[in-house]
């Protein structure tokens, strides 16, 4: 019997060992599956809501986990005038300003068997305006304008920018004059003089006899009379609708409302309601229908008789239709001729919208043929007035010809004569001075620090809600393009859908090690720095599950939208957060070193100019930590040199789930004026003067995230289950092993004794 007991104990021990192994494997697989489930970025992935990345990390405005606090500090330039005159700036750090920060991915679309996800990342900020908080909607600062900096950089200098603005002003001038609406405006502007003169001429042709004049006007069918006969059907009406007595009164120059008086004609056209009332109150005895008839006739003349009369005195318009039916020629008659089409500048017309006379002929007291004038507004012409390159050529040639009249061969500015080209040079300089420098720059861009290199805003508008007058000039019909604030803060989901970039990430389905990794940034798979750099790296808030548990010393590469690059992280320490073990990772110092591939020439100053449409944006750690102290002196922030507050980026990763359970995200936005120390910038060389090799701090922000207690409890539960699994497994294996070992040993011993 004792042999039977020992034989039975042996397989029982093996069974216990097997059960222990099975528990270990099954529980381990279950835990891993749960971690993966809590990492995969797809809707309805089965994860508990508080750890579901679709809710927690992608966003839900109703989820308090997704309402975070972002704190900003801004830099106020205290000497804006002196800075723009070439002195060193003096900045002052102001703040803090706190915001609730919500982000979510909208327009989400899964594809390629759910392995990839496209979306638009929608971020919103809401200022916390309450007791104990500074109000960013009231505090005002002066700061560098990235939009103006980008425009100057793209143009090549402020001088080049003025040339580009001159070309744009020329284009706007000729567009206004050659638009079909100018014919209407010209007809209205010239009608008082032209039609009143025609009525007077008709009266003169009739021997100053109102009765004869009325007969010619009302009944003649000949268009050879000095005025379009009333019987010629340019309006719906009958000559018999106005009696002879009424007509003669209208032709009598002594009457207050005579049609031979330019002032009256102007009143009829510009104030129809008032004119009608005046006509009805006059002694002419007009009925309401008759008054309407006269005013309709006057209005019809502005688009028929008046334009034809205006162009008929120009030899190039021997057939008036050649010029009245051609908007370009009609406008060029006003621009290129002296005297002009209207006999005066459009500047004299009320609400003309121009700061001075825009006409070439009027300003230069000379004129051009329509063919030559037209060539100046073709961008294919070597000499033209609508491309910056040609404007620059005209100005350079003009300077050389002024110094030496034989320095430029006439063939280079053909088809214009020497005198014509001199007039073009003179006119170009005039437009640059009067329209660009005197109006666009002074009155529209630089006025009251609304635009230009240094601007003035509330802190809130600076960060999220500013527009720039230069952008308004460049894109007059696209308000969405006027935004100049460095951070997006779109409040309307429809606007977000219409304007935000579509990006793509891996969901983790198929390959969990790719979870949340970016495929594109702002719609592109490569970053356009000094060389093409592929978008790659992990999502900062979700590393691949179990990645760190395999090797906590493994390098971590994280792609961040704000830094627009992949950053390498190094393990710093291990610790415990709310009962959960973690590893803390910080940005490697190597990320801040000089790197030609990223146009990075100054340690601890990351260059984003090629990514941000030429805007001179440079990122650093908050308070410029790490940068050479000389830049503190040149920015006037020496009080921050010895600041030792830890504001650096870090992330505490729970190694099994890969989730960032605690972390801090921070960066500072600056601009940098390139050039040699102690010299003035060659970029800012006309409207301002800036010192070279100076960092202008703008603002920094910090966002701290931490797992909630519920999330901690979920992860802690996993660790407790895991600990229980280990305990059960160890017990079963130890007990089973003991039974098998003892029973086997005793069985062998019994056999030996029996022998």
From Swiss-Prot:
Membrane topology, Lumenal segments = 28-727
Give the location of motif Di-leucine motif in residue numbers.
752-753
Swiss-Prot/TrEMBL keywords: Glycoprotein, Lysosome, Membrane, Transmembrane, Transmembrane helix
- What does the entry's PTM section describe? Heavily glycosylated.
- What InterPro entries does the database record attribute to this sequence? CD36_fam
Q: Which residues are glycosylated?
A: 28, 76, 379, 465, 497, 588, 607, 680
Membrane topology qualifier: Multi-pass membrane protein
GO CC terms on record? Answer: cytoplasmic vesicle membrane; early phagosome; lysosomal membrane; phagocytic vesicle; plasma membrane; vesicle; vesicle membrane
Enumerate the transmembrane spans: 7-27, 728-748
Pfam families to which the protein is assigned, alphabetical: CD36
What compartments host this protein? Lysosome membrane
According to its UniProt entry, the protein's GO biological process terms are: phagocytosis, engulfment
Major location (coarse): membrane
Gene Ontology MF: a single term: scavenger receptor activity
Per the record, the similarity remark reads: Belongs to the CD36 family.
The function of this protein is: May act as a lysosomal receptor. May be involved in macropinocytosis and fluid phase exocytosis.
What PANTHER family does UniProt report for this protein, alphabetically?
A: LYSOSOME MEMBRANE PROTEIN 2-B, SCAVENGER RECEPTOR CLASS B TYPE-1 SR-B1
Official protein name in the record: Lysosome membrane protein 2-B
| Gene responsible for this protein | lmpB
């Amino acid at each position: 019997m004792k042999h039977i007991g020992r034989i039975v104990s042996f397989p029982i021990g093996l069974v216990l060992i097997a059960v222990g192994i099975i528990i270990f494997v099954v529980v381990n697989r279950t835990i891993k599956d749960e971690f993966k489930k809590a990492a995969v970025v797809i809707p309805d992935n089965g994860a508990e809501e508080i750890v579901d990345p679709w809710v927690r990390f992608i966003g839900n405005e109703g989820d308090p986990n997704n309402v975070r606090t972002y704190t900003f500090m801004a830099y106020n330039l205290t000497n804006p005038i002196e800075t723009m005159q070439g002195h060193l700036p003096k900045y002052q750090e102001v703040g803090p300003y706190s915001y609730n920060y919500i982000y979510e991915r909208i327009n989400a679309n899964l594809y390629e068997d759910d392995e990839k996800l496209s979306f638009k990342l929608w971020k919103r900020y809401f200022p916390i305006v309450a007791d104990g908080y500074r109000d960013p909607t009231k505090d005002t600062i002066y700061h560098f304008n990235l939009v103006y900096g980008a425009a100057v950089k793209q143009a090549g200098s402020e001088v080049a920018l003025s040339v580009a603005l001159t070309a744009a002003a020329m284009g706007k001038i000729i567009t206004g004059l050659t638009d079909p609406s100018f014919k209407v405006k010209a007809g209205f502007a010239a009608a008082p003089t032209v039609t009143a003169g025609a009525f007077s001429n008709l009266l003169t042709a009739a021997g100053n006899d109102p009765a004869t004049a009325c007969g010619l006007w009302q009944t003649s069918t000949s268009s050879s009379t000095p005025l379009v006969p009333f019987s010629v059907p340019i309006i719906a009406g009958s000559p018999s609708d106005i009696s002879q007595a009424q007509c003669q009164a209208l032709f009598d120059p002594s009457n207050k409302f005579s049609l031979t008086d330019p002032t009256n004609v102007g009143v009829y056209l510009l104030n129809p309601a008032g004119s009608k009332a005046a006509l009805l109150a006059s002694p002419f005895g007009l009925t309401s229908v008759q008054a309407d008839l006269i005013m309709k006739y006057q209005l019809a003349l502005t688009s028929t008789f008046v334009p034809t009369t205006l162009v008929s005195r120009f030899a190039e318009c021997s057939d008036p239709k050649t010029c009245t039916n051609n908007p370009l020629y009609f406008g060029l008659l006003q621009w290129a001729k002296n005297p002009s089409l209207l006999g005066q500048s459009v500047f004299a017309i009320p609400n003309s919208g121009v700061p001075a006379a825009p006409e070439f002929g009027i300003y230069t007291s000379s004129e051009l043929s329509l063919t030559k004038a037209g060539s100046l507004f073709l961008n294919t012409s070597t000499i033209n007035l609508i491309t910056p390159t040609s404007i620059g050529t005209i100005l350079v040639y003009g300077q050389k010809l002024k110094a030496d009249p034989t320095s430029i061969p006439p063939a280079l500015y053909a088809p214009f004569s020497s005198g014509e080209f001199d007039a073009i040079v003179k006119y170009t300089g005039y437009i640059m001075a009067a329209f660009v420098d005197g109006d666009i720059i002074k009155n529209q861009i630089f006025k009251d620090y609304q635009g230009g290199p240094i601007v003035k805003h509330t802190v809130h508008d600076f960060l999220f809600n500013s527009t720039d007058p230069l952008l308004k000039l460049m894109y007059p019909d696209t308000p969405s393009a006027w935004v100049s604030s460095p951070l997006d803060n779109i409040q309307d989901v429809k606007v977000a859908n219409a304007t935000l970039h579509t990006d793509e990430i891996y969901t983790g389905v198929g390959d969990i090690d790719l979870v949340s990794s970016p495929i594109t940034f702002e719609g592109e798979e490569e970053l356009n720095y000094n060389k093409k750099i592929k978008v790659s790296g992990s999502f900062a808030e979700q590393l691949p599950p179990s990645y760190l548990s395999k090797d906590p010393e493994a390098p971590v590469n994280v792609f961040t939208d704000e830094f627009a690059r992949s950053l390498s992280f190094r393990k710093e320490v291990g610790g415990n957060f709310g009962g959960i073990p973690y590893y803390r990772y910080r940005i490697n110092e190597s990320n801040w070193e000089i790197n030609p591939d990223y146009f990075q020439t100054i340690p601890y100053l990351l260059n984003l100019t090629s990514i941000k449409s030429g805007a001179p944006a440079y990122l650093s750690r908050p308070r410029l930590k790490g940068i050479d102290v000389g830049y503190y002196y040149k920015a006037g922030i020496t009080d921050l040199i010895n600041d030792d507050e830890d504001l650096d980026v870090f992330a505490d990763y729970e190694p099994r789930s890969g989730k960032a359970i605690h972390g801090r995200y921070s960066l500072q936005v600056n601009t940098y004026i390139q050039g040699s120390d102690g010299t003035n910038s060659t970029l800012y060389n006309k409207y301002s003067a800036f010192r070279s090799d100076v960092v202008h701090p703008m603002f920094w922000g910090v966002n701290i995230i931490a797992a909630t207690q519920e999330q901690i409890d979920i992860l802690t539960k996993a660790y407790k289950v895991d600990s229980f699994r280990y305990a059960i497994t160890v017990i079963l294996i130890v007990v089973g092993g003991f039974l098998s070992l003892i029973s086997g040993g005793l069985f062998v011993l019994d056999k030996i004794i029996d022998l």
